[in-house]
Amino acid sequence: MARMHSRKKGSSGSRPPVVDKLPEWCDVSKEELEKTIMTLHERGMSNAMIGLTLRDQYGVPNLKLILGKSLSSFLRDRNALPEIPEDLSNLMRKALRLRRHLLRAQPRGTVSDTSISRLPRTKDIHNKRALQLVESKIRRLVRYYKQVGRLPATWEYRPETAEIQISSKQ
């Protein structure tokens, strides 16, 4: 399968081995793990950071084998899932950084004219293109999350309000 925004072929990556039981050295109980996940979530950690912390500091090799479900499913059951999915909010942050760069670092929240063709750094064609690619990825993800039902059907990405949406949902 090809890469999304280039003409390169993809390369196959490694997969974790198929494991159906926990190793004997893992002594974390399900209740202890649930409590730890909720405390890490209350500290404001994202799903990816929770997974890394559990792996590196608590020695949890496979969260799904202990809980019986994924981290997102566990947080959804506890009504603790953020309104905007993590991958979408990361892309929105990236688009905001690029747009702010193209606007010559104006203060936060003053993105007045969002048309890419009218940005002050008109010669920075590489970052303009990067912004276009990131925003197309955002639109693609929004379409997917609407189909799945993770985002409301009326939700839409607007660069003017992206900073407010990201900061209010953290």
UniProtKB/Swiss-Prot annotation:
Superkingdom classification of source: Archaea
Pfam family, one: Ribosomal_S15
SUPFAM superfamilies to which the protein is assigned, alphabetical: S15/NS1 RNA-binding domain
Protein name as annotated: Small ribosomal subunit protein uS15
Region (Disordered) residue spans: 1-20
Gene Ontology CC annotation, any one: cytosolic small ribosomal subunit
Assembly behavior: Part of the 30S ribosomal subunit.
Keywords of the record: Ribonucleoprotein, Ribosomal protein
Example GO BP: translation
InterPro entries referenced in this protein's UniProt entry, alphabetically: Ribosomal_uS15, Ribosomal_uS15_arc_euk, Ribosomal_uS15_N, uS15_NS1_RNA-bd_sf
Organism name: Methanothrix thermoacetophila (strain DSM 6194 / JCM 14653 / NBRC 101360 / PT) (Methanosaeta thermophila)
